[in-house]
Swiss-Prot record:
One of its GO terms (biological process) is menaquinone biosynthetic process. Catalyzes the thiamine diphosphate-dependent decarboxylation of 2-oxoglutarate and the subsequent addition of the resulting succinic semialdehyde-thiamine pyrophosphate anion to isochorismate to yield 2-succinyl-5-enolpyruvyl-6-hydroxy-3-cyclohexene-1-carboxylate (SEPHCHC). Signal peptide: none annotated. The lineage of its organism: Bacteria, Pseudomonadati, Pseudomonadota, Gammaproteobacteria, Alteromonadales. It catalyses: isochorismate + 2-oxoglutarate + H(+) = 5-enolpyruvoyl-6-hydroxy-2-succinyl-cyclohex-3-ene-1-carboxylate + CO2. Disulfide bonds: none annotated. Belongs to the TPP enzyme family. MenD subfamily. Binds 1 thiamine pyrophosphate per subunit. It is an enzyme of class 2 (transferase). This is 2-succinyl-5-enolpyruvyl-6-hydroxy-3-cyclohexene-1-carboxylate synthase. Pathway: Quinol/quinone metabolism; 1,4-dihydroxy-2-naphthoate biosynthesis; 1,4-dihydroxy-2-naphthoate from chorismate: step 2/7; Quinol/quinone metabolism; menaquinone biosynthesis. Its cofactor is Mg(2+); Mn(2+); thiamine diphosphate. Keywords: Magnesium, Manganese, Menaquinone biosynthesis, Metal-binding, Thiamine pyrophosphate, Transferase.
Length: 567
């Protein structure tokens, strides 16, 4: 009877954990199969408040959870068994920590007596994620530990989470309960009204510090030639407020690819390429004041401009306290929601409209890109611009070359997509799985633009794509290797080819077929547009493989840069 009660108590603790997470605003739980996590899996299977997502590969599962958390703006739970299953989550946890996305890992574990003695599938799991996750270690379930102790520990750990949390859950066998004959009424009685409410046992107010300058400080700050820079911003931060702020101050708004404003007609979205133009760069160098929202800028030219300019006044606005400035500039950092800071009583700048010429220069580049990309030879930049110009949808842009092409050449459009990236650690792993999570939250129409090596990294996440209920278009830019290295100063072409680009000669048609996904291979823009139209109308995931020459993108980038420098 006592052995049977162990299994039932394991399940009870699992049920308490999943119920409390649901009350702490968790909407999704991602699970991989495994025995040691059975108490958590069985509890999740019975939990009607959480949407379940299952996948056989823990590495992809972690990135799926990352995408769900990005799209839902809420914590996402992940359940894994013991051993290397937990370790496979590491890349996603690193990305989540760097970008402050809340993931809650619930890892099943062996009890203490089975660690370090040769027991099967047993590794030291506490602190496996080092500094990249907050660590919570639960003992094996025990009637001597009151349930309210478990709930308060979860509440304090998860409430207002700004990054990953690892809850390690030790369980003794048996793991599979039988008749559920144990009566836990007395054990649960201290929980009182919690059993009949929908609120967490402990409710923690958000202790977020909010800071704002005085009216006098605002007046002093805007006295000069200023620029506003929009870094990485989420759609929910209301980045469009920066358009109004820029117009009020009379300062140019320079926008990063991840700002949600890269394609806005009132912003200077072509800033990366404008910094190649001598006249535009000289004008920007007249600025003495900068107001930065967010961080993690993509463009090296914009990063260099920000770090090399001699600023008299430098303010950065962040939603929470962190360091997002690799140049380590002297500045005032304000902790504030973007919208609240933009809506302060800003006076008009004494140097309003000092950089109006940038608007014309930005529009001239837009015309150049239309002529030399849209109306020129088929290539990667042409495909990226075509996708970005399709209006309202979710757009996940892969790392390496795709996101840089978007940053350099995205079109100015009246309606732009919601842009997502994984630019914390900027890895090329897990990109398809992340896009699947973003698409799955509300089954919203989503396009992923991904390079061929990135897709090879995450090939088995096509199984996740096959489960999509909404439109997910997977556009693979296949230039046969890591051809971003064509843009880097590798000293020898033989070294570049043999040690960096790693041409593979592979195509993705059979991979798509293996997972039952519709597939099109295209080599011209007419075929791409036809395939893309069909894919956007399809209620599920589909694959479009864009086949281009290895040097097409790098040669076009160099050619455009040469023209811009001479203009």
């Amino acid at each position: 009877m006592q052995i049977e009660k162990t299994a039932e108590l394991n399940l009870l603790w699992g049920s308490l954990i999943l119920e409390e997470l649901a009350r702490l605003e968790v909407q999704h739980v991602c699970m991989a199969p495994g025995s040691r996590s059975t108490p958590l899996t069985l509890a999740a299977a019975k939990q009607t408040k959480l949407k379940q997502h299952l996948h056989f590969d823990e590495r992809g599962l972690g990135f799926l959870a990352l995408g769900l958390a990005k799209a839902s703006r809420a914590p996402v739970a992940i359940i894994t068994t013991s051993g290397t299953a937990v370790a496979n989550l590491y890349p996603a946890i690193v990305e989540a920590w760097l970008t402050q996305v809340p993931l809650i890992v619930l890892s099943g574990d062996r009890p203490p007596e089975l660690l370090g003695c040769g027991a099967n599938q047993a590794i030291v799991q506490p602190a496996i994620f080092a500094d990249y996750a907050k660590q919570v270690n639960l003992p094996t379930p025990d009637m001597a530990i009151p349930p309210q102790a478990l709930l308060t520990l979860l509440d304090e750990s998860v409430a207002n989470a700004k990054g990953p949390i690892h809850v390690n859950c030790m369980y003794r066998e048996p793991l599979y309960p039988g008749s559920m004959s144990a009566d836990f009424t007395h054990y649960l009685s201290p929980l009182g009204n919690w059993q009949h409410s929908a609120l967490p046992y402990n409710q923690f107010a958000d202790a977020q510090l909010v800071s704002a300058p005085t009216s006098d400080a605002l007046a002093r700050f805007v006295h000069g030639k200023g620029v506003i820079i929009a870094g990485t911003l989420a759609p929910e931060q209301q980045p469009e407020q920066l358009i109004e702020l820029a117009q009020k101050l009379g300062w140019p708004l320079l926008t990063d690819a991840q700002s949600q404003l890269r394609q806005h007609g009132a912003a200077i979205g072509n800033i990366d390429q404008l910094l190649l133009q001598p006249k535009a760069k000289a004008l920007l160098q007249e600025a003495d004041t900068v107001l930065v929202f967010g961080g993690r800028l993509l463009s090296k030219r914009l990063i260099s401009y920000l770090s090399e300019q001699k600023w008299k006044r430098y303010w950065q606005v962040l939603p929470q306290q962190t360091r997002l400035d690799p140049s380590h500039s002297a500045k005032q950092v304000w902790i504030s929601p973007l919208a609240a800071f933009a809506q302060l009583p800003w006076p008009r700048s004494s140097e309003a409209n000092w950089a109006l010429q940038l608007i014309e220069a930005n529009e001239q580049l837009a015309t150049l890109f239309q002529q030399q990309i849209d109306d020129a030879e088929f290539g990667e930049a042409q495909v990226v611009r075509t996708i970005a110009g399709r209006g309202e949808q979710q757009l996940f842009i892969g790392n390496s070359l795709p996101v840089r092409l978007y940053d350099m050449y995205a079109p100015i459009t009246p309606i732009a997509p919601r842009v997502f990236t994984n630019r914390g650690a900027s890895g090329i792993d897990g990109l398809l799985a992340t896009a699947c999570g973003i698409a799955a939250h509300k089954a919203s129409s989503t396009t992923l633009v991904i390079g061929d090596l990135s897709q090879l990294h995450d090939l088995n996440s096509l199984a996740l794509a096959a489960k999509q209920q909404g439109t997910l278009v997977i556009v693979i830019l296949n230039n046969d290797g890591g051809n971003i290295f064509n843009l880097l100063p590798v000293p020898d072409e033989k070294l570049r080819s043999g040690y960096y680009r790693l041409a593979h000669g592979l195509e993705f048609g059979y991979g798509a077929a293996m997972f039952g996904l519709p597939y099109n291979r295209v080599e011209d823009i007419v075929s791409f547009n036809e395939a893309y139209d069909d894919a956007l109308a399809y209620p599920g995931a589909s694959v479009i493989e864009v086949c281009v020459a290895q040097d097409q993108a790098s040669e076009q980038i160099a050619r455009l840069a040469a023209w811009i420098k001479q203009s």
